[in-house]
Curated annotation (Swiss-Prot):
PROSITE patterns: ABC_TM1F, ABC_TRANSPORTER_1, ABC_TRANSPORTER_2, MSBA. Its EC number is 7.5.2.6. This is ATP-dependent lipid A-core flippase 1. SMART domains: AAA. It is an enzyme of class 7 (translocase). GO terms for molecular function: ABC-type oligopeptide transporter activity; ATP binding; ATP hydrolysis activity; ATPase-coupled lipid transmembrane transporter activity.
């Protein structure tokens, strides 16, 4: 991809408040790598307008000399001239359209790529508070709006503006008195365009928001279609989508109403100027000073001006739509990326891990609502302290919401601790570069994420350079081969979106195979065997025991039967450690762990 300009040092709110001209200049800066194509497009547009103006400039000689027979050569060469002129005009039109489309598509492709990369570089807190549908809408709908609106707008604005300037030049050349009358309406038209432009920007912003709502609603419903069918929620979802769809339609009709009203208003105002010219020509002094050809030319030029004025008014709405889309895109690009202030490299950790008086509150992630922030929010983690030696297994247990998964999120620096520090090999994890830190961990969560790709590529996602033998070995260890061998293409079988063609247990085994292949010093298992049947779980537990040898493991468990052999077990309640020890010592205490154990094995 071509190099993109540096993101302006604006906050997202500053970007939203930037003027149309500021946003346009910023957008044009993305076209710098394609400036030759842009220059060619401008030349084509100006050439197209020049041919049209030259045609009209021959109207006076045609009336005064050609039709009267005063210049026979004029009429003789006119047919050939028309053919040549239209050929040149067609070539100019092609150059303008093709080159502008080439520049526009490249700019939008770069912008879309940069937007995608920026969104993927945003902190987890940003994704927590932003709907996936709205982000997808920005990447698809908003960027397409920039392409369709701005590219078409530039073509019309440059071409028609050059045409208008050419016509005005001809009008003043033949009769400055009559032409001056037409210019008197310019301030009025400028005021109307300014008012209408503000309306266009406001409605365009609303349309983009409405499209984000449509995308979000559709995505949520499609992802949860089984739940909708199970609970008979079709009519409820139909009604909800209809309401959102209606809002989108209303915003579009507001845009159409403004656009439809602005064009005839400007044309009516222009007609007053035209009528006044007809009235002025009744003056004897003015009528005697111009020839019939001049008068016909002036009237024709003024009439011809109505069409480009209409086109410029129409294209203004599209231009404002494109600028509103730019504002939406730039507001994301101006968000700060995930902070990566670490400067230490880490090739492979020895496996030592420590939490030292760690506190964490989601209040500091900016994901909370205003009402939440006004409350004295309790800590999600409160004074968490423990140490793990290389190869040890720690199990975190407790009721839902006790902070177990939050602790694992801090390890990967999806969030940073509010207080205290987390150490790997006696070094604060915030001192490591993020990429080096995260490649120390394999992570298998309750919510398995697979990609619309082959089984082999999903297993090798964390290690794309893995050999076929390594992939097969990991697949065997996680019991993936048991079902892959029955597929027509084996490990090369495409498993559909998020592994839709696999069962829950099969999807979980693929995720475990992916973790096995990465061969990292740390392993995080967040209920990694929760979706397996009894037989599969037995095989997986054997594989996990092999995997956990010589690796530091953090196991988040609800089923206590899976962590009885853990070196350390920490029982958490409301973000605090209430007990810790091994299985036997905690049972002997007859405390919180023993109570959880008795509940599960009664």
């Amino acid at each position: 991809m071509a190099s993109s300009p540096k993101t302006n040092a604006l906050s997202s709110s500053d970007s939203a408040n930037a003027t149309t001209w500021q946003n346009f200049k910023r957008l044009v800066s993305y076209a710098k790598p394609y400036k030759l194509g842009f220059v060619a497009a401008i030349i084509g547009m100006l050439g197209y307008a020049a041919i049209d103006v030259y045609f009209l400039s021959q109207l006076k000689p045609l009336v005064d000399e050609g039709l009267s027979g005063a210049n026979a050569n004029f009429m003789k060469w006119a047919p050939l001239f028309i053919i040549v002129a239209f050929t040149v005009r067609g070539i100019a039109h092609f150059i303008a359209n093709y080159c502008l489309a080439w520049v526009g598509n490249n700019v939008v492709a770069d912008l879309r790529q940069k937007l995608f990369e920026h969104i993927m570089s945003m902190p987890v807190a940003f994704h927590d508070q932003t709907s996936t549908g709205s982000l997808i809408s920005k990447i698809t709908f908003d960027t397409e709006q920039v392409l369709n609106s701005v590219s078409k707008s530039i073509l019309t604005i440059v071409q028609q503006s050059a045409f208008i300037i050419g016509l005005l030049g001809l009008m003043f050349y033949y009769s400055w008195q009559l032409s001056l009358i037409f210019l008197l309406i310019t301030p009025i038209i400028a005021v109307i365009v300014s008012v209408v432009s503000k309306r266009f920007r406001k409605v365009s912003k609303n349309i983009q928001g409405a499209m984000g709502e449509v995308t979000t609603a559709a995505e949520q419903t499609f992802n949860g279609h089984k739940v909708v069918l199970t609970f008979g929620g079709q009519q409820r979802e139909f009604s909800r989508f209809a309401k959102i769809n209606k809002h989108n339609r209303q915003q579009r009709m507001k845009m159409r109403a403004t656009k439809s009203a602005s064009v005839p208003i400007i044309q009516v105002i222009a007609s007053f100027a035209l009528a006044f010219v007809f009235y002025a020509i009744t003056s004897d002094s003015l009528r005697d000073s111009i020839s019939p050809g001049t008068f016909v030319s002036i009237i024709t030029y003024m009439t011809m001006l109505l069409r480009p004025l209409k086109m410029l008014t129409n294209v203004n709405s599209e231009f404002q739509q494109g600028m509103a889309a730019c504002t939406s895109i730039f507001s994301i690009l101006d968000h700060e990326k995930e902070k990566d202030n670490g400067d230490k490299q880490l090739e492979r950790a020895s496996g030592t891990l420590s939490f030292k008086h760690v506190d964490f509150s989601y209040k500091n992630t900016n994901t909370m609502t205003t009402s939440d922030k006004e409350q004295d929010t309790k800590l999600a983690l409160n004074d968490i302290t423990f140490d793990l030696a290389p190869g040890e297994t720690l199990a975190l247990v407790g009721r839902s919401g006790s902070g177990k998964s939050t602790a694992s999120s801090l390890l990967l620096r999806f969030y940073d601790a509010t207080r205290g520090e987390i150490l790997i090999d006696d070094t604060n994890i915030e001192q490591f570069q993020l990429k080096d830190l995260r490649k120390q961990f394999s992570y298998v969560s309750q919510q398995v994420v697979l990609f619309n790709d082959t089984l082999a590529n999903n297993i090798a996602y964390g290690k794309p350079e893995a050999t076929e033998a390594e992939i097969i070995e990991a697949a065997k260890s996680a019991h993936v081969m048991e079902f892959a061998e029955h597929m027509e293409q084996g490990l090369e079988t495409n498993i559909g979106e998020n592994g839709a063609l696999l069962s829950g247990g099969q999807r979980q085994r693929v995720a475990i195979a992916r973790a096995l292949l990465c061969d990292t010093p740390f392993l995080i298992l967040d209920e990694a065997t929760s979706a397996l049947d009894t037989e599969s779980e037995r095989h997986i537990q054997d594989a996990l025991q092999t995997l956990q040898q010589n690796r530091t493991s953090i196991v988040i468990a609800h089923r206590l039967s899976t962590i009885e052999n853990a070196d350390k077990i920490i029982v958490m309640e409301q973000g605090k450690i209430v007990e810790q020890g091994n299985h036997q010592s905690l049972l002997a205490k007859q405390g919180a762990y023993a109570q959880l154990h008795s509940f599960q094995f009664e």
